[in-house]
Amino acid sequence: MSVNTIVPLTNVALLAQAVESAANRPPELPGLVVMYGPSGYGKSLAAAYAANLHRAYYVECRESWTKKAFLIAILREMGIIPMKTLSEMVDQVAEQLSRSGRPIIIDDVQYVIDKAAANVLTDIYNASQGTLILIGEERVPASMARLERLHNRVLEWVPAQAASLEDVVELARSSYPDVEMSDDLLGEVRNRVKGCLRRIAVNLYRIYSEALNNNWECVDLETWGDRSIHTGQPPARRH
């Protein structure tokens, strides 16, 4: 799904509003926004939309990254050739953020915060006073609480929300407009996967595929019958 066709789901709207607020904050206020929540809640989808909307730089962290690898990834996203030392690279990033006025979105930030590389984030913010959007797993707020210099620069905490029934209906209609999926079936899917957007997407595709195979134009819970709903658990072995 491209950023131009992203459905305006709950978390997409929440993050977009928070980025807008941070980008237009008074100069005396801090500029960090943190979205956090379980895997599969659509945080990266929200980040892609916000990056497109605000022309933000976007970096997705990796667990294996060192401070240097993290800074090089940011500079590559900015189209800047990295200098030799970490200090010089921090200055390069900060200067570009200040000069461009563009936010930077750092996804899977837990991989940086759980290491000494977290201090690099503080240095970048202090040197740029820019808008930094940090996105990560549920443990991110607790991890940041141990980093007072970073923690007290947060303007807004944005807990990612489980998908609502309205989200599921909107996603089904926009992704598979040729097949009408009833609210009772979509509600059952949502409840079974506890609002996990990634697993909802898997189930919508399975429903769509089954509808094509059976020439269904409409699918409700009764039609779906005893067919399985993917919850992430492997099926029980058959004896």
Please tell me what each predicted stretch does:
Residues 51-63:
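Conserved catalytic segments around the Walker B and adjacent sensor/switch elements
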Residues 66, 72, 81-107, 111-127, ...:
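Mid-core helix/loop region of P-loop NTP-binding domains shared across ATPases and GTPases
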Residues 33-39, 124-148:
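Sensor-1/coupling segment of RecA-like P-loop NTPase cores
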Residues 21-30, 97:
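Phosphate-binding P-loop
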Residues 1-17, 40-49, 54, 149, ...:
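C-terminal alpha-helical "lid" subdomain
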Residues 56, 145-162:
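A short helix-turn-beta junction within AAA+ P-loop NTPase domains corresponding to the substrate/partner-engaging
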Residues 5-8, 75, 83:
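Class I S-adenosyl-L-methionine-dependent methyltransferase catalytic core
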Residues 27-47:
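Walker A/P-loop nucleotide-binding motif
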